[in-house]
């Protein structure tokens, strides 16, 4: 009957044994590694740069500012209107200084101009992307990434031929427009080589 007692004592001692962090106080906490902090900072900076250069992201960031500016503009306009009405009626207006309506209106127009530029830039990028996909739909392999060559990629000599054909077409269009303008104005000038000069 004495045998179960050492086993029970062993079980109780085993259950009471704790790790080095629990018996001797709190264990060492994991500190963030410097590489993780640097990586997160670099990713945040890269994301901020992408937002600055991307017109769509810039547009999304400016929309809340435009709403807030419009609300401020309406509020300032109402306050100025109430004050002017009180002055016209001979009533005493509040002595609190009011915001200038022209400054708020100028800020609102500045945000509108920025939004217009973002939309124009986004439209221009979309047009260039569509033109690139239309006139040069295949990819061109680069010498720095030979492994990234795709089966439908365009060889570089053939790509140069396509570019030269596009330049020739642009020159022909420029010459035709110049001749048309000269005929309309009645002027005769020497034939121009067009944009870019000779190849």
Curated annotation (Swiss-Prot):
It is found in: Nucleus. Residues 1-17, 28-47 have a biased composition (Low complexity). Component of the Mediator complex, a coactivator involved in the regulated transcription of nearly all RNA polymerase II-dependent genes. Mediator functions as a bridge to convey information from gene-specific regulatory proteins to the basal RNA polymerase II transcription machinery. Mediator is recruited to promoters by direct interactions with regulatory proteins and serves as a scaffold for the assembly of a functional preinitiation complex with RNA polymerase II and the general transcription factors. This is Mediator of RNA polymerase II transcription subunit 29. GO terms for biological process: positive regulation of transcription elongation by RNA polymerase II; positive regulation of transcription initiation by RNA polymerase II; RNA polymerase II preinitiation complex assembly. Residues 1-47 are annotated as: Disordered. The keyword ATP-binding does not apply. Residues 18-27 have a biased composition (Gly residues). It comes from the Eukaryota. InterPro entries: Mediator_Med29_met. Its main location: nucleus. Component of the Mediator complex, which is composed of MED1, MED4, MED6, MED7, MED8, MED9, MED10, MED11, MED12, MED13, MED13L, MED14, MED15, MED16, MED17, MED18, MED19, MED20, MED21, MED22, MED23, MED24, MED25, MED26, MED27, MED29, MED30, MED31, CCNC, CDK8 and CDC2L6/CDK11. The MED12, MED13, CCNC and CDK8 subunits form a distinct module termed the CDK8 module. Mediator containing the CDK8 module is less active than Mediator lacking this module in supporting transcriptional activation. GO terms for cellular component: core mediator complex; mediator complex; nucleoplasm; nucleus. Belongs to the Mediator complex subunit 29 family. Keywords: Acetylation, Activator, Nucleus, Transcription, Transcription regulation. The modification N-acetylalanine is found at residue 2. Pfam families: Med29. It comes from Mus musculus (Mouse).
């Amino acid at each position: 009957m004495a045998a179960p007692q050492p086993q029970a004592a062993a079980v109780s001692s085993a259950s009471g044994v704790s790790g080095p962090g629990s018996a001797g106080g709190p264990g060492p906490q994991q500190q963030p590694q410097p590489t993780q902090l640097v990586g997160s900072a670099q990713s945040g900076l890269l994301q901020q740069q992408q937002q600055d250069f991307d017109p769509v992201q810039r547009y999304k960031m400016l929309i809340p500012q435009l709403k807030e500016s419009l609300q401020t503009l309406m509020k300032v306009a109402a306050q100025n209107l109430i004050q002017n009405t009180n002055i016209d009626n001979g009533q005493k207006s509040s002595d609190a200084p009011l915001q200038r309506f022209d400054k708020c209106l100028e800020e609102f127009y500045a945000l509108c101009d920025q939004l217009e530029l973002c939309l124009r830039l986004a439209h221009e990028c979309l047009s260039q992307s569509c033109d690139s996909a239309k006139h040069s739909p295949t990819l061109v392999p680069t010498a720095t990434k030979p492994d990234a060559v795709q089966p439908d990629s365009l060889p570089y000599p053939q790509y140069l031929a396509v570019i030269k054909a596009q330049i020739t077409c642009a020159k022909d269009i420029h010459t035709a427009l110049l001749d048309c303008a000269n005929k309309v104005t009645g002027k005769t000038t020497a034939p121009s080589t067009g944009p870019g000069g000779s190849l």
